[in-house]
Amino acid sequence: MGKPKTLFNKIWQSHLVDVQDDGTCLIYIDRHLVHEVTSPQAFEGLRMTGRKVRRPEQTLAVADHNVPTTDRSKGIADEESRIQVEALGSNTAEFGVPYLEMDDIRQGIVHIVGPEQGFTLPGATIVCGDSHTSTHGAFGALAFGIGTSEVEHVLATQTLLQKPAKDMLVRIDGALRPGVSAKDIVLAVIGRIGTAGGTGHVIEFAGEAIRGLSMEGRMTVCNMTIEGGARAGLIAPDEVTFEYLKGRPFAPKGAAWEAAISYWKTLKTDEGAVYDTVIEMDAGAIEPQVTWGTSPENVVALSGRVPDPAAEADPGRRAAIERALAYMDLKPGMPMTEVAIDKVFIGSCTNGRIEDLRAAAAIAKGRKVAATVNAIVVPGSGLVKEQAESEGLDQIFLEAGFEWREPGCSMCLAMNADKLAPGERCASTSNRNFEGRQGKGGRTHLVSPAVAVASAITGKLTDAQSLAPSLG
């Protein structure tokens, strides 16, 4: 019997092609997701060297960052964005890579499309030229973002040079309170470990609270692993995983499905395996969370207050808090529930799935968006949009005063028409609150879909549990 292994090490070792003297490893890549922003130079590199895409059938492309979420019949107004999307179309056609075009109902955010199509599978190595590739770790896949030069390397060789990571376990036991979601879990974890806490590690999430999450919830948790500084996030696959994947287009079928299930059931950390770092948290202690500053680690319970830099002993941290509060235009000690907002964004690869929209619609039903707030709902894919519309969720949002959009990355980042104006404050279900992330001078508060809707209704950051019963 060999040494007990962690889930990460099982996947890593099964994909090793070669190990160099300095410890650098060549690993095989099972799946490669491609989008329009980080791929043009990679395809050009192949063209210049006369190379082909080695495994086009293990590659899937979709445009998401630059696509408009309003009337698509008018095309893409911004020239640079249009060129990038057109280049993805021509490059994938030239190199034989499957591409979900903008008018394809399967189009959407790459990290929502991959799982939806069954392209994401347990035990696989998955890469994409995008930091939030960690999302796919929810399936027990080793998934991480890569740079443009690495995109070219994977296209050409289906392999990648990497140094092995350390192992971190984040165990969250106990039951979640009513109104607390997967988004609150991961924000609380980042608040605990900081944005550098996971540096050099792959984080495995485990415990009763994690096992109790749906696949959508697990994807939300793994999505923001990168905001905790980690290389990737992992959750061991189980019956919830298998049920989600069954029958999806790229998932195994028939005897191959049964064989896959048998293998996937081995993808769990062995008893006695040792982690480099272990973090334990009580799910029952987690409240709805909200960020107050310009880093995902600047997070407090929604029932809390804006921190006072004077209470921080470390000069560097004190200065960082002061700078963040100046940018966010917040006063120390101010209750977070008194912070007024201008915009609400529900969507992104963190919270743009059908479960997120159902949770949001349940709170929006029978209520109205405040007159001072502009609120938009952006489904994560065409299939999510179709499902939501079949359930009447779009009508609930529209009647409440939300805008109902086409799928895309939208206001998560200022690379398309959906942006904040300088000084505008947004309650956002996305994953980053850096200065200017949603538009130059824009101020971002990261929240769950429930908090986002409640905030849209009251015009200030609000816990959905505190709302009066709706009339709907």
UniProtKB/Swiss-Prot annotation:
Transmembrane regions listed in the UniProt entry: none
SUPFAM superfamilies on file: Aconitase iron-sulfur domain (SSF53732)
Cystine bridges: none
Top EC group: lyase
Keyword list, A-Z: 4Fe-4S, Amino-acid biosynthesis, Branched-chain amino acid biosynthesis, Iron, Iron-sulfur, Leucine biosynthesis, Lyase, Metal-binding
Gene Ontology process terms (BP): L-leucine biosynthetic process
MF term (GO), any: 3-isopropylmalate dehydratase activity
Catalytic activity, reaction form: (2R,3S)-3-isopropylmalate = (2S)-2-isopropylmalate
Gene symbol of the encoding locus: leuC
Residues holding [4Fe-4S] cluster: C349, C409, C412
Family: Belongs to the aconitase/IPM isomerase family. LeuC type 1 subfamily.
Protein name listed in UniProt: 3-isopropylmalate dehydratase large subunit
Chain coiled-coil ranges: none
Quaternary structure note: Heterodimer of LeuC and LeuD.
InterPro entries, A to Z: 3-IsopropMal_deHydase_lsu, Acnase/IPM_dHydase_lsu_aba_1/3, Acoase/IPM_deHydtase_lsu_aba, Aconitase_4Fe-4S_BS, Aconitase_4Fe-4S_dom, IPM_dehydratase_rel_enz, IPMI_cat
PANTHER family referenced in this protein's UniProt entry, alphabetically: 3-ISOPROPYLMALATE DEHYDRATASE, HOMOACONITASE, MITOCHONDRIAL-RELATED
